[in-house]
């Protein structure tokens, strides 16, 4: 009598089963190659401020430190003298700035302190998912670029401080409201002496401004100086890491599609 197989004795099908590997589709990050359409803030009163500015009756906040840099004046390399006779080539005459001399202040700070963001930050900041440093308590606003128009002149600068006069006006900075501030004719942006001079402004004027992605900014005097300047230090390009992450995602998506195709054959 021949031997009885395990399958015959048990009645079970022991045909080898093909194991299909589990495939998970990678989660898509924000696409950094899709331009964000930033809206213009039109007819905004602009005032001038500078690194090292001393407090006055009308402006009680000294500018040796910024909202995000407690050693702002030291890191810049000195006093950013606004006197036109003390400036050359859109920078201080007496030293080469170590930070970009083309800077602005806008009336919003995304931080509560060095450990925590404001609750609305993730909802209202357009580039939140593209920010370079995603740790808690690290600002996503410092260093972002703005485009400023005054008459026929167009200038570019980095956001490096908060003001004028308030730090919580996200409805204006990221929305469609007018500035909350009522002082200095409702000023909604502070400009550095370099920005002032390039635009041909006095110490107060009217401008249009908007945020702009770094990849769209042409070279100019705003690209010459500064360890905080991605023209000088490409590692600081705020969208560089986002582009790298997105390319990794696309490669993973390609690899998963290839494995899926092979498993079906």
Description of each model-found segment:
Residues 6-265:
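Secreted/periplasmic proteins
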């Amino acid at each position: 009598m021949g031997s009885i197989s395990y399958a015959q004795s048990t009645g079970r099908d022991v045909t080898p089963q093909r194991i299909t590997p589990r495939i998970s589709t990678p989660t898509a990050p924000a696409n950094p190659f899709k331009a964000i359409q930033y809206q213009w803030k039109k007819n905004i009163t602009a005032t001038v401020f500078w690194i090292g500015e001393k407090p006055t009756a009308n402006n009680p906040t000294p500018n040796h430190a910024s909202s995000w840099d407690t050693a702002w004046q030291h890191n810049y390399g000195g006093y950013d003298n606004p006197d036109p006779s003390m400036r050359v080539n859109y920078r201080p005459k007496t030293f080469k700035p170590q930070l970009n001399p083309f800077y602005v202040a806008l009336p919003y700070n995304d931080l509560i302190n060095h450990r925590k963001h404001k609750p609305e930050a993730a909802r209202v900041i357009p580039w939140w998912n593209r920010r370079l440093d995603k740790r808690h308590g690290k600002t996503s606003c410092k260093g972002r670029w703005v485009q400023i128009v005054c008459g026929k002149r167009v200038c570019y600068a980095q956001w490096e401080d908060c003001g004028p006069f308030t730090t919580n006006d996200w409805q204006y900075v990221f929305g469609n409201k007018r500035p909350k501030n009522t002082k200095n004719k409702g000023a909604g942006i502070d400009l550095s002496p370099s920005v002032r001079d390039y635009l041909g402004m006095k110490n107060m004027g009217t401008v249009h401004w908007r945020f702009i992605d770094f990849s769209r900014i042409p070279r100019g005097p705003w690209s010459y100086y500064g360890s905080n300047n991605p023209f000088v230090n490409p590692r600081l390009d705020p969208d560089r890491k986002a582009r790298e992450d997105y390319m990794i995602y696309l490669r993973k998506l390609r690899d998963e599609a290839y494995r899926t195709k092979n498993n079906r054959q």
